Amino acid sequence: MDIFNGLPDDVLVKILSFVPTKVAVSTSILSKRWEFLWMWLPRLDFGSPKTDLLAFLNTCQYDKEEEVGLVDFIDKKLPLHRAPFLAMYVCWKFLMNVGMKTYFHVRHLETRQREGKSLQDILSICPVLDDLSVICSVHQDVKEFTIIVPSLQSLTLFIENCEVFDGYVIDTPLKYLKLEDVHEEEHYCLLKKMPKLREAYVDVQLDDLKSLIGSITSVKRLNHMFREKSKILGQLLKDSPNLRVLNIFKVQGHVTLSTGVDCWNQPISVPECLLESLQIFNLSHYFGKQQDLDFVVYILKNACHLKTATILADEPEHLVPNLKELTLSPRASSTCQLSIRCGLGSERS
């Protein structure tokens, strides 16, 4: 024990981070110095089975006349927590079973969903939540879910090919949305309008997501992942009149060297964002195929207020076709700086 007492607090906290949460908290009875050390831990894991969880709670310092429970622990101990950031891992199903009598004042929450109803149950006890990540992975039986959180500002939603999946509803005034919906079967996606949305990351497998298009009209920064046969980009540009920054990525293995940007569907009329607001354009995984060239040239010759355009190619310069044509292509903005960066560090302007 004398060996540990001679170590600085940050080293002791590092040591505590390698042991289970219940063990770390139990060290608070060792001495006055150890009483609050566990409160500097950046991660607390309460994902234990019920029996282990209750055993853990009994190691905490409570008034023995008061009811011992996880909610009591969170109410009394977490407000004293001193770490600048806390990741709390908890068995939500256990919380639902024991019955909630209080609210969780958590602002950041990540959850892997197995049941749609349980998600809304969790959200209903988080009234000040502003950052939420929801993951629906393969083999998880999530049929549908709804997200209604008035305080929510940032949402990350990842949906894989779940075995049974009908769709989802999002009704919250977001400022940031990251949507990775790669579920290949038909499903509904109902996103209510988000007038405060400023940035969106969109990676979707299906094109028929009309509510998605209508919900991002106020976005100023758009990050979009190209997928083979997807034709949603033209519609995204058309319905984002305030767009200032456009970042385009391409899924390696989906958009190949032979296909290029085959999913670019040129709009009938020039989108308003190109004529009025777009200032920064970035494209990664440029292959130099004719489809790639046509897409970039379209942006350059129609973006009247473009300041910078950066094109990133994976291959060395001598393996990327049409670079000269791209460099000499007309630009609607006389102040636009075009930068083309190829593999192995070569660059041309």
Curated annotation (Swiss-Prot):
Transmembrane portions of the chain: none
Superkingdom classification of source: Eukaryota
Database matches in InterPro entries: F-box-like_dom_sf, F-box_AtFBL13-like, F-box_dom, FBD, FBL13/AtMIF1-like, LRR_dom_sf
Domain spans labelled F-box: 1-47
Disulfide bonds: none
Family matches, as Pfam families: F-box, FBD
Domain FBD: 263-311
Protein name per the record: Probable FBD-associated F-box protein At5g38565
